[in-house]
């Protein structure tokens, strides 16, 4: 039987001669290989009778006339969700092999856009703005490419559910990537602009209800991430599962004016009171600019209850300016919320970074600490710190190490940049 020829399905909100007046109707007719071409106009429940989520079938390309020209307006449709964060509570749901390009996607009550778990998708040249929860939810894709988009003011419902650990789990990222068990989890995020998120500009995590052994690789390249109410980038190899294997490359981004951290990476950060063990995070942070946050780049081996987790971090060639506390901060393990952190490790190379106006202490490396009186034992940082340009501080070191609580250690490889080893226990701060 001969293969079906691909079709072009045209949608217009204003041209009465167009075959379709709503995107919903055209997508119901589209099959793999088809392109749904959407003319200028506002497409919404009240204007064109849209039904959300708009499901883009496998292999279908949905193309608008450009940002600001073709607008998909949710008018507050869809709901926030947590544990799980639901892909179906999104204005647009992308099937495997589908593409979304050339739209302003606005005003969803839940998420703006999501992929079906495991789907390979391309999301490019869109504006994604003012959604109640996340701008874009990426769940376990075979491969997702997210390129040349503008994200603005996502997390409008200011949703901050309490996690089982009794801490606030802010929801409202521009892009929320969740690694899924048994899936490929390959994501490329490049050339995007992300401004004013309620939580983080970009969060990449293995969520706490996944099975053990999740593998994920994310590349974050040449993005602008700014003015997030919490962090620019959050990276967590595990919020609960053990044996995760996560690799994240962060290169040539500008990350500025975020409240807490520019980049915070954690091999294990339990959000429920269950032990995480042997999760590995490899994070490579090269040639970024980080400006004006609480801390610049922070690496954490494992929080309690965590044991035997490893973060392998490379921080090279970055410009870090205007931090209130530290430009680079590394801690092997942190006892947390009544639970111990034991035998977690960070291996770190910190080299050829330029630090300006760094606040309290430009580079600070600590073996083990605790939030209150929790145990932290056997945690270790093995670091090579060399050839960084650091400001001179009157009466204070520019680079210091502290073993922390008894039974933890920081080891520096030679050659090592001039530093001070601080005695006693330096208190942990979030």
Question: Where are the regions a protein language model picked out?
Answer:
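Right-handed parallel beta-helix/beta-spiral solenoid domain characteristic of secreted/periplasmic
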Residues: 5, 13-17, 40, 44-47, ...
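Extracellular/surface-exposed low-complexity segments
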Residues: 2, 388-390, 403-430
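Extracellular beta-strand/beta-solenoid scaffold signature
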Residues: 48-53, 75-92, 107-114, 130-138, ...
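Beta-strand repeat architectures
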Residues: 27-34
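Solenoid scaffold repeats with emphasis on beta-solenoid/beta-helix
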Residues: 36, 54, 60, 70, ...
